[in-house]
């Protein structure tokens, strides 16, 4: 924030900002990850984590441990921290924090609908949902047969309701339509969040708009690569891209006609901020692209802590915790499956 906004920031939000900056110091370091990567079994992983801020959440877990247990308990810490922030927050910070959870809501909706389509048990699916994206009527998603029913029966009373305006059709729910729904919802959500941050102004708008633009560009690349070789038309692909970001609009026009990964690479290398990402990847491969994007995201998230008096630190902290949990899930899976030679493949160091 700038000028007079800076003078009043601490009155309402200074305490929470200090809490978040303090919590950030509890994120795992490169030394922690190196120790975790040397573990022989999941009990060793638990032993190392009990010496960190995850200790109280894991110390009473009996053996034998499972990867899902470790991830669940580490996620519980993130949820507790988020709830603490929400309890202390006043407007407009409380609305900003709610926006952060909408992405998880979308993922949960897609998880339930996809699982139901493949005749999975609803209770089993609910256990896999992210706790930050839960809402009261989520179990009722299983009864919907098409987008219109999904909206009318369940989602009309949730924060996702405004994002469904472009999704409401009478087409039956199948795998392709569900993925289109996910990306259409994400597009509407990111555009709405972007506009909200613009209204907040100051450093919050400056930093958050940059972070959200990066997210929109990453999603555009992923949509393009994942739709290569499918029946999705160029026009349909173009409609799924968010209407902001560094790639908007000319990069989107080029991505919409790409037919292989190397063509996507050719488009992205025209944009200097993304050249370093694709320089890490060999021609013709996309397996390591996710890690390269995550590394760039972590770099940008860490930079947001260099300024004060803005809300982006709350977004950045939650995203960094989520990345840390992804790291722990990967390490735990590699240890559990005795694949220690691959343990560094997907770990993204934060510090």
From Swiss-Prot:
The keyword Cell division does not apply. Pfam families: vATP-synt_AC39 (PF01992). Keywords: Hydrogen ion transport, Ion transport, Transport. GO terms for biological process: vacuolar acidification; vacuolar transport. One of its GO terms (molecular function) is proton-transporting ATPase activity, rotational mechanism. GO terms for cellular component: proton-transporting V-type ATPase, V0 domain; vacuolar proton-transporting V-type ATPase complex. V-ATPase is a heteromultimeric enzyme composed of a peripheral catalytic V1 complex (components A to H) attached to an integral membrane V0 proton pore complex (components: a, c, c', c'' and d). Belongs to the V-ATPase V0D/AC39 subunit family. Subunit of the integral membrane V0 complex of vacuolar ATPase. Vacuolar ATPase is responsible for acidifying a variety of intracellular compartments in eukaryotic cells, thus providing most of the energy required for transport processes in the vacuolar system. This is Probable V-type proton ATPase subunit d. It comes from Oryza sativa subsp. japonica.
């Amino acid at each position: 924030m700038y000028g007079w906004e800076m003078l009043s920031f601490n009155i309402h939000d200074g305490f929470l900002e200090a809490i978040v900056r303090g919590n950030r110091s509890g994120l795992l370091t490169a030394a922690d990850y190196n120790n975790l990567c040397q573990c022989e079994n999941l009990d060793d992983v638990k032993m190392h984590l009990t010496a960190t801020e995850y200790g109280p959440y894991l110390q009473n877990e009996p053996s034998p441990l499972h990867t899902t247990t470790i991830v669940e308990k580490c996620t519980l810490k993130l949820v507790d921290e988020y709830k603490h922030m929400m309890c202390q927050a006043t407007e407009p910070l409380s609305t900003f924090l709610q926006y952060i959870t909408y992405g998880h809501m979308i993922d949960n909706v897609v998880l339930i609908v996809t699982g139901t389509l493949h005749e999975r048990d609803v209770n089993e699916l609910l256990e896999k949902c992210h706790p930050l994206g839960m809402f009261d009527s989520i179990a009722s998603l299983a009864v919907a047969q098409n987008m219109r029913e999904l909206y009318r029966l369940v989602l009309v009373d949730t924060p996702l309701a405004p994002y469904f305006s472009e999704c409401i059709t009478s087409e039956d729910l199948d795998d392709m339509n569900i993925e289109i729904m996910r990306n259409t919802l994400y597009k509407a959500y990111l555009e709405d969040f972007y506009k909200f941050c613009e209204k907040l102004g100051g450093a919050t708008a400056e930093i958050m708009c940059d972070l959200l633009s990066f997210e929109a560009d990453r999603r555009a690349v992923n949509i393009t690569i994942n739709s290569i070789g499918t029946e999705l038309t160029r026009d349909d692909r173009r409609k799924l891209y968010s209407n902001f970001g560094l790639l908007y609009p000319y990069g989107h026009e080029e991505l919409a006609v790409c037919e292989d990964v190397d063509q996507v690479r050719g488009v992205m290398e025209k944009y200097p901020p993304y050249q370093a990402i694709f320089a890490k990847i060999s021609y013709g491969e996309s397996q390591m692209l996710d890690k390269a994007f995550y590394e760039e995201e972590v770099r940008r998230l860490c930079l947001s802590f260099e300024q004060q008096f803005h809300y982006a630190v709350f977004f950045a902290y939650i995203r960094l915790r989520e990345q840390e949990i992804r790291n722990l899930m990967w390490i735990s899976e590699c240890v559990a499956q005795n694949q220690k030679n691959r343990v560094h493949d997907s770990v993204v160091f934060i510090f």
